[in-house]
Each structure stands twice: as C-alpha cells, then as structure tokens.
Amino acid sequence: TVCHKCATPCPVDIDFGDVSMAIRDVLRRLGNQSPNPAKSAAMFFLNTNDPGTIKLTRKLMIDWGYKAQRLGHRTLGKLGSAQTRRPPATTGGRPPVREQVIHFINKKMPGGLPKKTARALLDVEDRNYVPIIRDPAGTTSDSEAVFYFPGCGSERLFSQVGLATQAMLWHAGVQTVLPPGYLCCGYPQRGAGQFDQAEKIITDNRVLFHRVANTLNYLDIKTVVVSCGTCHDQLLGYEFDQIFPGSRILDIHEFLLEKGIRLEHATGARYMYHEPCHSPMKTHDSLTVVNALLAAGTNGRIEKNDRCCGESGTFAVARPDIATQVRFRKQREMEQGAGKLRGDGFSGEVKVLTSCPSCLQGLSRYDDDAGTGADYIVVEMARHLLGPAWLESYVQRANAGGIERVLV
C-alpha cells in the first residue's frame, strides 16, 4: 500500500509506500503488471483534462456506475453479509471473479452527489483563462489573494467539497485564484506506478503555475490552499516558494482557523473525526483544528476514530477483497465510536467528519452499519455558517459578477 504508515515504526527507516510505488513502476515497464479494468478506468478519469471527456466519464462512472453498484448492493447485499461478518483470507492470490463482485458490492457507494463538477457549475472549464473569484461587495483588487488547488477528488468527484472551500474563502473576504482548467497533482499516477505520466503532469503543472504567477504577480499570492492530503503531499515537491515567492501551502481548515472563522452555535449533531492516512493538516494538530472549528465547548469534544477507511483511492476497486478485510476492523471502530456518542441517550444525528475526498467515499459506506453520516469538515461549516442552501447561493452569487477571467 502507499499509506506510508509503516515508515514511522520501521526500525531500519524504510518507507514501504515508496517501495510499493517503485515496484509497481518496474512491473509496469516490464509488462508484468496485472491488468485491472476498474483501476484503469479510474486512472483514465484522473489523467484526462478535457471537459467533454470528463463530463462523459463522470456520467458513466460516477452517475450510472455508482447507481449500478448501489442496485447490486440492494439486490445481492445478503450474499455479502457473510464477507463483512468474517472476511475470508486473501492469501494465495485473487479470489474468483464471483467473489470479487460480491466484495465490490458488499457496502454501497455514496449517492446524491452534485450532477456537475465544480468548474462546470461556475463555467470556468476553459484552460486558457485563470478564474479569480471574489465577492464584489466585500473585496477589492487589493484584498488578500490565495491560490486554491482543488485536485481531482474535490473538483471532479465530490464537487461539493471544492465549492464549499471556495464559498468559505468568499466568506473570509479573500480573492480565490483557481488553476486554469482541470488539473491532477500527479500523486495518483505515482501511486499506480505510472512514474513517467506523473513526471509529465508535474512538469506541465509547474510550467503552467509559473505562467499564472507571472500573469498575476500584482496579486502577491502568499498562500496556496488545498483541500486534499495527497494533493498537499505532492504539491510540497512543486517548490511553490519559487513560483509564488514567500508562499506556503495550507489546508483550508487550518486557513479558516487562522482567520478566526468557526462555528459559535450548537448544530444539534455530535461528531467524531476520521484522520486520513495522508492528512492535509501539517501546520497544526488535526484534532485541535477540528475541535476549534466546530465549537467543541458547545457541540461536545470531538474524538478521533482510528483505522483506515478501506477506500484509499483506487484500492477499493482494485482489490475489493482486501478492502473488505480493512473495512471489517473500521466498522467495529465506527460502531464503537457512534455508540459512545449515544451512550447518554442522545438520539440526534451522529456524523463522522474527514478531510480527504477518498475517505469521504469510504466512510459513507458505513452509514447503514453505524447509523452515522459522513461529511467533510468544510462542507459542515458551510452548511451551518452560510445556510442549508449554501451551494446554490454561492454558485448564483459567483456567476453574477463574482468571477474574473484572465487570459494566461
């Protein structure tokens, strides 16, 4: 795996995440990598940056594909109950196709996702223009500007995450500069062992970002905002301090904490926090940030819910049999965590919050088992600070004169 969890306790200081990626790259170049249609489809979705292709692929994979998986879960879910109660061993290679299919549908995919990507909703898909998003009534051309890199998960898949980040930056009174067009950071390609593709993406992105920085040097950008941990990890190698001199990379939640933006009222829900393997919060302790943002004194202290969610990018579709084993342990943690929050007779909503798009998908699979609801921290904040119709309101206001498009 590429979670890098082995690196910390390893007595000889070997990062087996890096080793795994290197082995995959060698096997691919030698032509010995096992074919996996589901993984190939996912990588195709991440590699393309053509708006039309993304729209079609999203329709087929996310809209129809997720619906088909949920239908399979409803129809054949009982066949998977034995797997989730006691996962079978995975030694000896892959299980038969029939078992793999049951592993794939034993926990349902999330539903109710936005019908379009964040860029499509804001009409900023043209890669020849850099969008600058600002509140015309609350900002000027001299207001603080940040560069927001949404990444694939927050932009193409869970577009509500990217939009919530933009809405909260709008609320904070800053100008938000988006990259021109759909971009991937390159981490998924490295994780899949496609080192040559990853290097091409990284090089192209860095050249593009230098052009953006030269074009918008009057904005004096000092902060690069991210909403995804793997994007954060990958962007650390982009040398942004040479692109935007003196800049730093900061997670959206840490940025909001620094701006003093947090909930001040009771939400009626209780929370636990799932920390991703690739945590985007690297400046402050993640649990401290979550408790500060969500008013722990009013809504109750938020505890960490341990164990991997079992999604891990393409892991759950590439090896659903192993993902079933990982989920078995996580489900116990989820049920115990939710039970603790309900221990005093609390009958309201229990939510598990995270800061990773892939984990958001993985955690939503436990909704029925643990009686929880999975969501993103910044989405929960937008809902309670900006109102239940925050997404529609933000899109409407941004499209009504809040977007400047600069040719790059």
Q: Predicted segment positions?
A:
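Iron-sulfur cluster-binding electron-transfer modules in prokaryotic oxidoreductases
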Residues: G17-V408
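Cysteine-centered iron-sulfur cluster-binding motifs in ferredoxin-type domains/subunits
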Residues: T1-I14, D306-C308
